[in-house]
């Protein structure tokens, strides 16, 4: 008999009835819960957002009553803050004119002091001047005049708190007019006086939101706190990569276990920098702000005669090319000798460089693209270090300054060779017309971390450029005198 492969009529009717019941239940659920309506609204909003995404601005897009910066932020449930913070450095230039007493002329926007002559260079690449009597040379480092930080805040709710921190984490509670920074309403505009280079952070709170913004200030005649942090972070990243360890493990290693994490190290650096004082900065702030900059010696301090540990301070100090390094001098005597570099003039003041001069000069090199930020923390490409390689013509020593040779033909300083060079004998070390800021000799400054120690900067020829880059600091007792420490002078136009 042929077997029936279909279903009975009764079974078919039962199946249809069950399906109708299920459809009715599903429709009832959708209607009662308004899922269709929600889906339509979301779909419409999303479609509209996609259509308008190419027109996104600072206001973002609104989906279902909330603002998002991008479609991705909407997908990831990351709405925009209801608080907006804008921070910027402002400045107000004042005219500098040639008065015939302090200033002889203005060349390329730079004041040339009486008793000096313009040699070469532009304002953004290094204007060089020369003493009409001694032939010592100096380079102008520009600084914006009357700098302030302007902070503008807008919120959709009443602002309940504004916290402003300087690069050391110190709270700023006064504005530039020394009035309290008050909190009121949904907007706030404050203007503050920046005190040091580094990161300034503003945190704003309302009843339902909180936002922060950071501004890195590099343009001041002041210490740079944040660059010290960034230099250590560069060391940590390099060590972590080379040793295949975490950055926290690298932070612990380079601090000898004193810091267990990178965050702890950053906090420690801030605390450390609070101990670094430099009273010489305030002495010259008026001149720097009035004239819009300062002069730094083009060369490390030089001497006509080769120096030894018993040389004393009788040699005249020079800022000229191809002189013997003025080494074997302690910090105290460096202050005295640096002050003589105005050659008795009263329209300019000479002084041992301070931390503001050093940090501002390096930041200026970065601003003008003479060096990259990475090259400030690994200065192999522009400094005389053990691991650098370049050609030079002039004086050099291969035995830590005991004996010098002078070459008149281009000579190669090979990698992993240690040469103490005469001043400015290779353009390899020249940036914006300034020589040897990176390597060759450590350079004394007026900065101090304690009552008995003083800071020298820039590294030296026996070290690698990553261990002691241009931004590095080292501490020595003020009476230390070594073959690898020299100094440099700065010039300030008199008020």
Q: Which role fits each region the language model picked out?
A:
Residues 5-27:
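N-terminal single-pass transmembrane signal-anchor helix
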Residues 29-53:
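Aliphatic-rich helix starts adjacent to a transmembrane/signal segment
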Residues 78-150, 237, 241, 246-248, ...:
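GGW-centered surface loops in extracellular recognition modules
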Residues 123, 133-135, 225-436:
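Short aromatic-cysteine micro-motif
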Residues 192-198:
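Surface-exposed, short loops/turns at beta-strand junctions within beta-sandwich domains
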Residues 204-206:
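Conserved structural position at the C-terminal beta-strand
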Residues 211-219:
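Edge beta-strands of extracellular beta-sandwich domains
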Residues 328-342, 348-349, 353, 428-429, ...:
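Disulfide-stabilized, aromatic/cysteine-rich ligand-recognition loop
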């Amino acid at each position: 008999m042929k077997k029936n492969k279909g279903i009975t009529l009764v079974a078919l009717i039962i199946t249809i009835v069950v399906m109708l019941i299920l459809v009715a239940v599903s429709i009832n659920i959708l209607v009662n819960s308004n899922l269709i309506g929600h889906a339509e609204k979301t779909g419409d909003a999303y479609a509209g957002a996609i259509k308008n995404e190419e027109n996104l601005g600072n206001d973002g897009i609104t989906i279902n009553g909330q603002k998002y910066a991008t479609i991705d932020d909407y997908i990831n449930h990351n709405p925009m803050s209801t608080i907006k913070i804008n921070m910027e450095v402002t400045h107000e230039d004042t005219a500098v004119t040639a008065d015939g007493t302090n200033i002889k002329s203005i060349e390329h926007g730079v004041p040339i002091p009486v008793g000096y002559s313009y040699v070469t260079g532009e304002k953004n690449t290094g204007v060089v001047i020369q003493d009409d009597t001694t032939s010592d040379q100096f380079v102008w480092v520009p600084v914006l005049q009357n700098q302030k930080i302007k902070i503008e805040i807008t919120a959709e709710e009443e602002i309940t708190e504004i916290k402003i921190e300087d690069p050391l984490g110190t709270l700023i509670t006064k504005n530039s007019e020394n009035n309290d920074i008050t909190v009121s309403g949904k907007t706030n505009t404050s203007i503050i006086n920046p005190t040091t280079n580094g990161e300034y952070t503003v945190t704003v709170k309302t009843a339902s939101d909180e936002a922060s913004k950071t501004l890195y200030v590099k343009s001041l005649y002041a210490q740079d706190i944040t660059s010290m942090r960034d230099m250590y972070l560069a060391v940590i990243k390099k060590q972590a990569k080379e040793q295949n360890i975490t950055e926290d493990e690298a932070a612990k290693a380079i601090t000898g276990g004193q810091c267990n994490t990178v965050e702890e190290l950053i906090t420690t650096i801030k605390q450390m920098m609070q101990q670094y004082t430099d009273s010489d900065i305030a002495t010259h702030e008026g001149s720097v702000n009035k004239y819009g900059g300062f002069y730094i010696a083009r060369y490390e301090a030089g001497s006509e005669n080769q120096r030894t540990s018993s040389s004393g301070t009788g040699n005249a100090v020079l800022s000229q090319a191809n002189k013997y390094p003025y080494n074997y001098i302690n910090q105290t005597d460096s202050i005295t000798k640096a002050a003589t570099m105005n050659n008795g003039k009263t329209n300019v003041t000479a002084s041992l460089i301070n931390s503001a001069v050093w940090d501002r000069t390096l930041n200026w090199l970065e601003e003008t693209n003479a060096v990259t930020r990475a090259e400030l923390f690994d200065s192999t490409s522009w400094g005389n270090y053990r691991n650098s390689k370049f050609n030079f013509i002039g004086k050099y020593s291969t035995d830590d300054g005991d004996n010098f040779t002078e070459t008149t033909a281009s000579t190669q300083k090979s990698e992993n060779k240690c040469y103490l060079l005469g001043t400015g004998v290779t353009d390899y070390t020249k940036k914006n017309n300034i020589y040897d800021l990176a390597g060759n000799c450590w350079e004394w400054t007026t900065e101090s971390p304690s009552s008995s120690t003083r800071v020298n900067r820039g590294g030296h020829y026996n070290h690698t450029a990553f261990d002691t880059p241009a931004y590095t600091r080292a501490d020595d007792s003020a009476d230390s005198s070594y073959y690898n420490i020299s100094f440099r002078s700065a010039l300030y136009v008199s008020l």
